[in-house]
Structure formats: C-alpha cells, structure tokens
Curated annotation (Swiss-Prot):
With S4 and S12 plays an important role in translational accuracy. Located at the back of the 30S subunit body where it stabilizes the conformation of the head with respect to the body. The keyword Ribonucleoprotein applies. InterPro entries: Ribosomal_Su5_D2-typ_SF (IPR020568), Ribosomal_uS5 (IPR000851), Ribosomal_uS5_bac-type (IPR005712), Ribosomal_uS5_C (IPR005324), Ribosomal_uS5_N (IPR013810), Ribsml_uS5_D2-typ_fold_subgr (IPR014721). One of its GO terms (biological process) is translation. This is Small ribosomal subunit protein uS5. Belongs to the universal ribosomal protein uS5 family. The N-terminal domain interacts with the head of the 30S subunit; the C-terminal domain interacts with the body and contacts protein S4. The interaction surface between S4 and S5 is involved in control of translational fidelity. It comes from Acidithiobacillus ferrooxidans (strain ATCC 23270 / DSM 14882 / CIP 104768 / NCIMB 8455) (Ferrobacillus ferrooxidans (strain ATCC 23270)). The keyword rRNA-binding applies.
C-alpha cells in the first residue's frame, strides 16, 4: 500500500534524501517485535528544505511518514550567488555542534554524513561544513537546521540597518 502512494506522488521537483534507518526491537513474551525509524530530508534545491522522522513496522511506511513530515515542515534559507551561504554560522542541538562556512566557486560541498545530504537538498553547491561533538544523525540534522535558522539574507540586514546592499557588502560608502 505504501509503495502505491509513493509511485502516485506528483513529481514536484523536490529532492528526497534518506539519511538514516534505525531498527528498533521490543521484547515481548513471544519474542521480539521489530520496528523501523527513518530520517528523511526533502529540498527543492533552491533554498527550501525540511526534515522528518517516521516510525512504522515496515521500512517503506516509515520512509513515507518521514517524507510527508519533511514536506510539511519546510524552511527557507538565503542562498548567495555561487550556491553558498552569506557568512560563517554555527548550530547546536544537544551534544552535536556543526560549523558551516561559505566557500569559493568550484569548491563543492565539503561535508560529511547527514550534513552533506542536507546541504545538497537545500541547493548549496559551495560550502565547507564540519560536525563536532555527537555524530548522531538526528542531532546533526537538527544542529544543521539550527545553523540555517541563524542565517539572515544580506537584503534583510541592509533593510534592518537602513543601509544599501552595497554598504553591507563592503563595496563603498566609507568616509575614511
């Protein structure tokens, strides 16, 4: 049944990336009952991304639940020309800490594990990322989203300060 739902889903240009599947077991009188938990990231490749967790007795059903949740909880981040972020940022969740830094054109996505999948889904093409502390995939993804939440577009910063975009980027407007 879950397979039919996945095939009939419209192709809306979203990239779906499976990050982690965890098999869990519950010991009962008659033996073990197995279940599965899936962690998915969904992004449009142009600044919108979301993640979701799904639990079910079968893997495909858990993946479908995680994908549906990721599509519901999308967030957007400001992307710069060249597919990078505007400035270095750090995110935390629990013991997981991630650092994201902008990279020059042609660098590619230099990131490992769960962070690489998130960066590719959101559309980052040139970024350097480092995971510190915990390497639990769920906490690393949450820390990455925490870092994304701290990003503010240069246009929003300029508007907030009452300056032009050129002054914010350091391309003139200095009196010295």
């Amino acid at each position: 049944m879950a397979r039919e739902n996945r095939d009939t889903q419209p192709n809306d240009g979203m990239q779906e990336k499976l990050i982690h599947i965890n098999r869990v077991s519950k010991v009962v009188k008659g033996g073990r009952q197995f279940g599965f938990a899936a962690l998915m990231v969904v992004g449009d490749g142009d600044g919108k991304v979301g993640f979701g967790r799904g639990k079910a007795k079968e893997v495909p059903a858990g993946i479908q639940k995680a994908t549906d949740q990721a599509r519901r909880w999308m967030t957007s981040i400001p992307l710069m020309r060249g597919g990078t972020i505007p400035y270095p940022v750090e995110g935390r969740h629990g013991a997981a800490r991630v650092m994201l830094r902008p990279a020059p054109e042609g660098s590619g996505v230099i990131a490992g594990g769960a962070m690489r999948a998130v960066c590719e889904a959101v559309g980052l093409r040139n970024v350097v990322a480092k995971s510190l502390g915990s390497n639990n995939p769920i906490n690393v993804v949450r820390a990455t989203f925490d870092a994304f939440d701290k990003l503010i577009s240069p246009q929003a910063i300029a508007m907030k300060r009452g300056k032009s975009l050129k002054e914010i980027r350091g391309q003139g407007g200095h009196d010295e």
